[in-house]
Amino acid sequence: SNTKISVVIPVFNVGETIIDLLSNIPDYVDKIYLIDDCCPLGTGKIAENSKANTSRLTIIYNKKNLGVGGAVKVGYEKCLLEDSGIIVKIDGDNQMDPNQIKKIVDPIISNKDLDYCKGNRFLEMIEIENYPSIRFYGNIFLSFMSKLSSGYWDIYDPVNGFTAINSNILKKLNFDKIDDGYYFESDM
């Protein structure tokens, strides 16, 4: 496809993990925007000084901590300025496999009626078995609360941050109405 694909990665307290994530982002991704949200571990500098720093990587350093939603919105705005076609958001903690980007981008490319696609961390049973108990049960609770408040019962992992969005629909969103913090995922 000729669709320009960009990836936005908000980082805070990620550290060296970012190198593995950046190294595994597939070659068909045109641009990568890493948003260092005043990370005390210096994740932006770690990425900047690593072999993963290629010409497709742009590192943006926020002057103050904006929260995960605020950091993603900074990345989204940059992608819109650069005429990205589809924008993928993936967390910097390497919780999601960047090799799965194709699975959330392809439905948007192949179906002109589809503008947004959300990943599911719990699709594979092996992933659930390896998930820390506190995070697993916390996600169950947050997912239930999100479904209860939104009415979207068919979304299996509503607080998951692995998403793809068509830039044409992203341009229509009012970023002021989208949370700058953790509720960003639910607002989207």
Regions found by a protein language model. Name each.
Residues V14-T17, C39, D97:
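Donor nucleotide-sugar binding loop of glycosyltransferases
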Residues N62-K64, V68-L81, P98-Y182:
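Acceptor/aglycone-binding surface of glycosyltransferases and processive sugar-polymer synthases
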Residues S84-Q95:
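Short beta-strand-to-loop acidic/aromatic patch adjacent to the donor-nucleotide binding site
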Residues D36-K45:
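A conserved acidic beta->alpha catalytic loop
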Residues S6-I9, Y33, Y61:
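Short hydrophobic beta-strand elements that form part
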Residues F12-D27:
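Short, well-formed alpha-helical segments that are part of the catalytic scaffolds
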Residues Y182-M188:
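Acidic donor-binding loop at a coil-to-helix junction in glycosyltransferase catalytic cores
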Residues K4-S6, K31, D187:
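Cell-envelope/extracellular polymer assembly enzymes that use nucleotide-activated donors
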